[in-house]
């Protein structure tokens, strides 16, 4: 089945349609490549671009070198220094089904003078990551600059911004001549969700998708702002390749990995077009579990000599093709809109949808963000809407189908008062969010207490939604500090388990008083401060008193934070209500463990890689190693000193065996640290088992 174009809808005058379509595609190109603000979904753009190519194929007299489907990328930004790529950075042509994939192979065979039905091709299969393309230029092994793709010939220098990304080598030993390393900079789905959660709290603009986030972060003039976005990269190609001992694309990937560049674990070596189609089908099934957004696979002819022989069109290689994932959009009905109140007082609208199965799971709700979002989409109860999973995970309403709107559907009236306490709601000028300003609002108290005892904060077991509701309803507590004043008698009167259950809860509360400092910092619920930033603050200041005394400048200087977070933390800790809460927590005996601030150099010169399911969060282990002078990278190379492997370690373990890199389990790491005078570090910080400390997922 062919991918649907729009040729059947074309007007009688093909030139008029061509000119209109050319302008439309060019407009979308500028929005996507130059403004990082796409105006339509990728699949809609693909349909428009395909129709334009079909018109140019049918009417060659229409096309010229300035056609938006014959050029690459967009104009470089004047805000950054331009640089000419030694070899052009191209785009990729697309296919959308197995028939088109076989057609592409026939064209490839024809360009190489081979039989059209040949099945002798070997391919590499790679994921098509939805990020921003970059080019890293090395001369005699030294990184000279990093640049965006730009228009394919001239890009924008973003070296300082790229160097905030983990594992980008600045020096390659023993390499002479010129080398270009190409890849994709991306924002992980988890960091995308965290950014938007903070943006919703602050009322600042949301990112439309992770690709937008990556592009915007990489184009920040201040690299410290880029650092706070936690960008990552996957490198997958070379342009100029002096000194690279590779005859195939697969050998290029292996060489990049050996040099320490981050590469994809999902790439595969494939024999024949049937294997390529099977790889694509497997990636479709797996793509909801990827760390990053991917909108397809890329299939490349493996032989570099055959690549050179096949050559390029004006915009794309003939020897590679992007096989796009199908986009599943489902029609459903917007049954109702409710407005909830979060712990910051934000009024958060939620869409309730007729349940539909999308990509293997039932979807019945979707976030609507704020009043402007509802108004801009003109969403009305009763509307038929198209829903997809953003990034394969988060349900998102894409658009309304106005021709199916009921006659009596009225615009949604956003509440002017808090739906819980009735207090008049407020919306500051320039803020996208509406808030309940009542600090005593039961909904806010409920959410703040739930967050305080949650697993990523103080981790107090046994205090669930029902108990928090009862405690607030009975007037036994008003905030988190009140939890530490509860008696066994009060709890026994509420809990079905009576005295035994009450005793367990009081024991959990008592144990939480001396948990690590970062847990309390996170539990306070400050804007922009989640688990990772709480750990950074704890490491930087050591004690709660140290953090309370810190200046905005000192907080801003903490690696990975920056000015916006510093302002938010300073304002939160200066708030009288926050100071009162902290004082009452301390009066109740909450005295978190101090963090070790002093850096040492016992591990100086050692490079570590972490892999597999570890009993403690990987970020915690990484912080310990770096605090002692070690370096933690993401790829096993000949420079790696130790691979620390948990359960279900994958390809990194095999790679360590190939290179002769020593492998340590967690007991071995603890022994190494003890030998170096760093004490016993093999037990979780708060004495919990791995299952209770949010163990890091397996990573191959």
Curated annotation (Swiss-Prot):
CDD domains: BRCT_DNA_ligase_like, LIGANc
Active-site residues annotated for this sequence: 128 (n6-amp-lysine intermediate)
Entry binding sites for NAD(+): 42-46, 91-92, 126, 149, 184, 300, 324
GO BP of this protein: DNA repair; DNA replication
EC category: ligase
UniProt superkingdom: Bacteria
Protein name per its UniProtKB record: DNA ligase
Organism of derivation: Deinococcus radiodurans (strain ATCC 13939 / DSM 20539 / JCM 16871 / CCUG 27074 / LMG 4051 / NBRC 15346 / NCIMB 9279 / VKM B-1422 / R1)
Gene symbol of the encoding locus: ligA
């Amino acid at each position: 089945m062919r991918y649907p174009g729009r040729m059947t809808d074309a007007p009688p005058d093909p030139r008029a349609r061509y000119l209109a379509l050319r302008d439309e595609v060019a407009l979308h190109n500028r929005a996507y490549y130059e403004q990082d603000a796409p105006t339509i979904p990728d699949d809609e753009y693909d349909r428009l671009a395909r129709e334009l190519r079909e018109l140019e194929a049918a009417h060659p007299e229409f096309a010229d070198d300035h056609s938006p489907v014959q050029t690459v990328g967009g104009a470089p930004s004047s805000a950054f220094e331009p640089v000419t790529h030694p070899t052009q950075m191209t785009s990729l042509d697309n296919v959308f089904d197995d028939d088109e994939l076989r057609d592409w192979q026939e064209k490839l065979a024809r360009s190489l003078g081979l039989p059209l039905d040949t099945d002798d091709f070997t391919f590499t299969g790679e994921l098509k990551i939805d990020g921003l393309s970059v080019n890293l230029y090395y001369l005699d092994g030294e990184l000279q600059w990093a640049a965006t793709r730009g228009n394919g010939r001239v890009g924008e220098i973003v070296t300082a911004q790229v160097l905030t990304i983990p594992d980008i080598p600045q020096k390659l030993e023993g390499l002479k001549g010129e080398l270009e390393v190409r890849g994709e900079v991306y924002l992980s789905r988890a960091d995308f969700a965290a950014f938007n959660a903070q943006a919703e709290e602050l009322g600042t603009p949301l990112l439309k998708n992770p690709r937008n986030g990556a592009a915007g972060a990489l184009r920040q003039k201040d690299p410290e702002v880029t650092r706070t976005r936690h960008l990552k990269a996957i490198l997958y190609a070379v342009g100029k390749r002096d000194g690279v001992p590779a005859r195939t694309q697969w050998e290029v990937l292996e060489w990049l990995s050996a040099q320490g560049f981050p590469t994809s674990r999902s790439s595969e070596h494939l024999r024949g077009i049937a294997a390529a189609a099977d790889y694509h089908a497997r990636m479709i099934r797996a793509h909801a579990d990827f760390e990053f957004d991917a909108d397809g696979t890329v299939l490349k002819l493996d032989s570099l000599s055959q690549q050179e022989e096949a050559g390029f069109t004006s915009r794309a290689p003939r020897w590679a093709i992007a096989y796009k994932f199908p986009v599943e959009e489902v029609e459903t009905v917007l049954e109702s809109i409710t407005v909830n109140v979060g712990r910051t007082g934000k009024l958060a609208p939620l869409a309730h949808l007729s349940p539909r199965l999308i990509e293997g799971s039932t979807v019945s709700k979707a976030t609507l963000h704020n009043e402007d979002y509802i108004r801009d989409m003109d969403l009305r109860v009763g509307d038929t809407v198209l829903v997809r999973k953003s990034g394969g995970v988060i349900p998102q309403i894409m658009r309304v189908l106005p021709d199916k709107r009921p006659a009596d559907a009225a615009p949604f009236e956003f509440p002017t008062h808090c739906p819980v306490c009735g207090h008049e709601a407020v919306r500051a000028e320039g803020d996208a969010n509406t808030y309940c300003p009542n600090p005593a609002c039961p909904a806010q108290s409920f959410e703040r207490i739930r967050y305080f005892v949650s697993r990523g904060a103080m981790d107090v077991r046994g205090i669930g939604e029902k108990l928090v509701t009862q405690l607030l309803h009975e007037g036994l507590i008003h905030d988190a500090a009140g939890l530490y004043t509860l008696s066994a008698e009060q709890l026994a009167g509420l809990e079905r388990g009576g005295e035994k259950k009450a005793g367990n809860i009081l024991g959990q509360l008592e144990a939480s008083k001396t948990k690590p400092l970062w847990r309390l910092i996170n539990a306070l619920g400050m804007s922009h401060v989640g688990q990772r930033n709480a750990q950074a603050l704890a490491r930087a200041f050591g004690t709660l008193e140290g953090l309370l005394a810190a200046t905005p400048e000192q907080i801003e200087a903490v690696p990975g934070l920056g000015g916006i977070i510093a302002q938010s933390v300073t304002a939160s800790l200066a708030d009288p209500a926050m100071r009162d809460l902290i004082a009452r927590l301390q009066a109740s005996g909450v005295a978190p463990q101090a963090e070790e601030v002093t850096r040492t150099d016992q591990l100086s010169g050692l490079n570590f890689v972490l892999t597999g399911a570890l009993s403690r969060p990987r970020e915690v282990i990484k912080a310990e190693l770096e605090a002692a002078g070690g370096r933690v990278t993401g790829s096993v190379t000949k420079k790696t000193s130790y691979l620390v492997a948990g359960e279900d370690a994958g390809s990194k373990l095999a790679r360590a065996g190939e290179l002769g890199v020593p492998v340590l389990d967690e007991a071995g790491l603890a022994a190494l640290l003890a030998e170096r005078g760093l004490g016993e570090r093999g037990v979780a910080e708060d004495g919990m088992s791995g299952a209770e400390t949010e163990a890091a997922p397996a990573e191959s």
